[in-house]
A protein has these predicted regions:
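Bacterial N-terminal signal peptides that target proteins for export
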Residues: 2-16
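N-terminal signal peptide c-region/cleavage motif recognized by signal peptidases
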Residues: 21-26
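A ligand-binding cleft/hinge motif common to bilobed small-molecule-binding domains
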Residues: 101-110, 174-178, 205-237
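N-terminal (or domain-start) structured segment
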Residues: 27-117, 156, 164, 180-205, ...
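Extracytoplasmic/secreted proteins, especially bacterial periplasmic and envelope-associated proteins
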Residues: 49, 53, 57, 78, ...
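An extracytoplasmic/periplasmic, membrane-proximal ligand-sensing/linker region
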Residues: 32-34, 177-178, 218-219, 265-326
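Hinge/capping helix and adjacent helix->loop/strand transition within the periplasmic-binding protein
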Residues: 85-91, 106-193, 242, 247, ...
Length: 326
């Protein structure tokens, strides 16, 4: 004889098994239609370049289009806000970035998203130092000359960025603070626009993403002063780092793949497996490194730790320079 208690228990067990089976089927069938990859940065920016390379491979491996959708504005906050509101069904993948995930929460008091509450990390895709550049026609030949000029002429030098709260903005803020100089910030809407402003002489310098910056350097429109990493890059051994002049200075740009928080875990697991395979592919890694982008492919937990650590770092910087934006 089966008691009411065991009848209830059996029903619960059956429901659990059905739920597990449904999740398995969801992951097995996924994706069954095109997937939107939301990039909160402009076409041609570092996050965009990485995402397009990886999205093409995802399309090939999983048999459905992974289509990049650039949603720009407010230092990436508009795009992240849209990602936070997306249906948690696996058909919107969101690109998180050092600026949107760890800088903006420390300088914007009223964000439309919460990096921890609204998103589930999948994997960090790349890390990359920024490239400090001036116009090719500039009289400033190196970092020491730039600092000397800034000290001799307080308030004269300017730097552009891809917008308030972006990595290029905070790289300039931290550099000026550590070098003991004053640099006037001129925000633009996109990273390519910030670089073009330097090349045309509208502003003195910028800290640009390497994929859009190097073509302008090679075209003799920009001059590279140095990378923002702690040590020189193996791919560019002749390019100095700013830390050779400003001791201890380091800023790494990075981005990664995320999902809206309530997306089924099985879908996240499947995407993680595919992304790790893609980022570990020698041809993809070579393509990325040629542009100064270093593949990562860590676990969701490791990516979450990076977000936590970087949030604490930029909180200290924002507090030290008393930076807060409406």
């Amino acid at each position: 004889m089966t008691t009411p208690f065991f009848k209830t228990l059996n029903r619960c067990a059956a429901l659990v098994l059905l739920s597990v089976a449904a999740l398995g089927a969801t992951a097995q069938d996924y994706p069954s239609k095109p997937v939107r990859v939301l990039v909160p940065h402009a076409a041609g920016s570092s996050p965009d370049v990485v995402t397009r390379i990886v999205a093409q491979k995802l399309s090939e491996r999983l048999g459905q289009p992974f289509t990049v959708d650039n949603v720009v504005g407010a230092g990436g906050s508009i795009g992240l806000g849209a990602g936070a509101k997306a249906a948690p069904d696996g058909y919107t993948v969101v690109i998180g970035h050092v600026g949107t995930l760890t800088i903006n929460p420390n300088i914007y008091p009223n964000l439309s998203y919460d990096p921890l509450r609204d998103f589930a990390p999948i994997t960090q895709s790349v890390t990359t130092p920024l490239l400090a550049v001036v116009a090719a026609t500039s009289a400033l030949k190196n970092t020491a000359e730039l600092i000397a000029d800034a000290k001799a002429n307080p308030g004269k030098l300017t730097f552009s960025s891809a917008g308030n709260g972006t990595a290029s903005h905070m790289a300039g803020v931290l550099f000026a603070s550590m070098a003991g100089i004053s640099l006037t910030h001129v925000p633009y809407k996109t990273a390519p626009a910030a670089l073009t402003a330097v090349a045309s002489g509208d502003v003195t310098m910028t800290f640009g993403g390497q994929p859009p910056a190097w073509p302008l350097v090679r075209a003799n429109r920009l001059r590279a002063l140095g990378l923002t990493s702690a040590a020189r890059a193996a791919e560019f051994p002749d390019v100095p780092v700013l830390a050779e002049t400003v001791k201890g200075y380091e800023v790494l740009d990075w981005n990664g793949f995320m999902l809206p928080k309530a997306t089924p875990v099985a879908i996240g697991t499947k995407l993680h497996r595919e992304l790790v395979a893609i980022l570990s592919d020698p041809d993809v890694a070579k393509q990325l490194r040629a542009q100064g982008l270093n593949p990562v492919a860590n676990t969701p937990a490791e990516f979450a730790t990076v977000i936590e650590r970087e949030t604490q770092k930029w909180a200290r910087v924002a507090k030290a320079v008393k930076l807060s934006l409406d």
